[in-house]
Design a protein with these regions (language model features):
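A generic transmembrane alpha-helix motif of multi-pass inner-membrane proteins
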Residues: 176-177, 365-384, 388, 395-461
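Membrane-interface "cap" regions at the ends of multi-pass membrane proteins
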Residues: 1-42, 55-60, 71-72, 456-461
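Helix-loop-helix junctions that connect adjacent transmembrane segments
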Residues: 3-6, 45, 122-127, 155-285, ...
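Hydrophobic transmembrane alpha-helices that form the core helical bundles
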Residues: 32, 56-136, 140-144, 289-306, ...
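Juxtamembrane helix-boundary/capping and inter-helix hinge elements in multi-pass membrane proteins
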Residues: 35-40, 68-72, 81-87, 223-231, ...
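TM-loop-TM module centered on a large, flexible mid-protein loop between adjacent transmembrane helices
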Residues: 75-80, 84, 117-121, 235-298, ...
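Membrane-interface loop-to-helix entry segments
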Residues: 127-181, 213, 236-240, 374-380, ...
Length: 461
């Protein structure tokens, strides 16, 4: 089997974590958090911090595992050394055919959507859909033809996307304190949160889960990272902390640009326009486009390397084909082609399920969030077996970190089930109807995993 070149350093790995997480979520989820808490600023900040802490807890556990294990694809390797080759295969199959392409396809559409805002396009129209397809192919092309250039773009996109966040955090806070808007937003609420403060907090945390998702994608470059045992743990921890700090201060800065009532109705663009003028509003949309493209690039890195991770273990369909590395670009070309195909299929599904009247009936679900139901659930056996097997480790690494990570995973899974299962079911039941997106997502998940079981081992000659 051909080996991948060690080409990425610590800055790229940190940018992969920051760039993959800080995407569309930080800009439009702030509005959702305000709505969930009824405009209660301190409660909203607490929600951002809670979810951020959960992400850091999982990062710490994976950082601990990265210090001991490394092979090809990060989290898949951790699954193999803890739960065995069989479990690692199914985790990799899930990542390749559901998680990476589902998230990547949505980010392609979101990138096109915010670009379309600049020209007044219909957000569900053919222009945005065509542009989404183009951005998907463009990201694939960048990663397939020049992985090093893709890494440099990741660094550039991370720096650019932090500019509006930093500006809003500083200028928005100062302007808000000067005008009194920020003080007013902190001391008053627009309305009582549904279910009281506890219900509002839980709903807000659910809203922030998507904004924090994606950090684990950085582990997909484990085999291409220089000194991975040291650099990957550092990248996961530093990157996660940067994300939490950026989200909290951006959220505060936005509140300095408009009242909570206005922000709930119109979103963060109004705050940028109030502080920086019309040009500032346009600048925000441009930065959002760059932010989403950076996130798309980070997810495409994982999507294009997925089948390589499976075939490198001699499993899956045609392993001898998918583990080939192009000699001129040092890229896993055949694996990349499969990644693009599956991403395109999920883009078609996302459009039909979420941007039209619904092509799939009960099987319409949000492919941007529901993979969380399984990705965190699939981490749980890894952490449990780690505690059982790693007897030579001290108390902190063997028990404390994995237990905290298990609690974080359990919360994430329950939050996703609550938001996409319990709530829509109760709302539909009140109207004499039935709706449970998470149930039908899990059916699709089961079918895809059964296909994976069918092609698990190559046929013997």
């Amino acid at each position: 089997m051909e080996k991948l070149e060690k080409r990425y350093g610590l800055p790229t790995a940190i940018c992969m974590v920051v760039g993959t997480v800080i995407g569309s979520g930080v800009f439009f989820k702030a509005q959702n958090v305000l709505a969930a808490t009824g405009g209660d600023m301190p409660l909203g900040i607490l929600a951002w911090i809670i979810t951020g802490v959960l992400m850091i807890l999982c990062s710490l556990q994976f950082a601990s595992m990265a210090q001991k294990y490394q092979k090809v694809s990060g989290v898949v390797d951790y699954a193999e050394v803890t739960c065995g080759k069989g479990y690692a295969y199914y985790l990799a199959w899930f990542l390749v055919n559901i998680y990476y392409p589902g998230m990547t396809s949505v980010l392609a559409w979101v990138s096109a959507r915010y670009f379309g805002v600049l020209f007044g396009w219909d957000l569900a129209g053919p222009e945005v859909l065509c542009l989404a397809g183009f951005t998907l192919v463009a990201s694939y092309t960048l990663n397939a033809f020049s992985p090093k250039l893709a890494g440099k773009f990741q660094i550039s996109a991370t720096v650019i996307k932090l500019i509006p966040i930093v500006l809003m955090a500083i200028v928005g806070t100062v302007a808000g304190l000067k005008s009194g808007v920020l003080t007013s937003n902190f001391t008053t609420v627009v309305s009582e949160a549904v279910g009281g403060k506890s219900g509002g907090l839980f709903a807000a945390v659910v809203a922030t889960v998507f904004a924090y998702e994606g950090w684990i994608v950085a582990t997909s470059i484990n085999a291409e990272l220089k000194n991975p045992k040291t650099n990957l743990p550092i990248a996961l921890i530093i990157g996660s902390i940067i994300v939490v700090v950026a989200y909290v201060f951006y959220y505060i800065g936005v509140a300095g640009g408009a009242t909570n009532a206005v922000l709930i109705e119109e979103g963060a663009t109004t705050a940028f326009t109030n502080i920086f003028g019309t040009i500032g509003g346009t600048f925000l949309n441009i930065c959002i486009v760059i932010s989403c493209l950076g996130t798309l690039n980070g997810l495409m890195v994982g999507a294009t390397r997925g089948m390589y991770a499976i075939s490198s273990r001699g499993e899956g369909p045609r392993p001898e084909m998918f583990n080939q590395v192009d000699k001129s670009t040092n890229m896993v070309t055949n694996s990349s082609i499969w990644g693009l195909f599956v991403c395109s299929a999920w883009l078609l599904y996302f459009y039909g399920a979420n941007l039209t009247s619904g092509w799939f009936g009960y099987f319409n679900f949000d492919s941007s969030e529901l993979p969380i139901v399984t990705i965190y659930g699939l981490y749980i056996p890894i952490f449990i077996i780690w505690m059982i097997k790693e007897k030579e480790l001290g108390f902190v690494k063997r028990f404390l970190l994995p237990v905290l990570a298990l609690a974080a995973c359990g919360f994430m899974v329950f939050a996703a089930i609550y938001a996409h299962g319990i709530t829509p079911y109760l709302n539909a039941k009140a109207n004499g109807e039935f709706s449970c997106p998470v149930l039908f997502y899990l059916i699709i998940f089961a079918v895809i995993m059964l296909v994976g079981a069918f092609v698990k081992k190559p046929k013997k000659k």
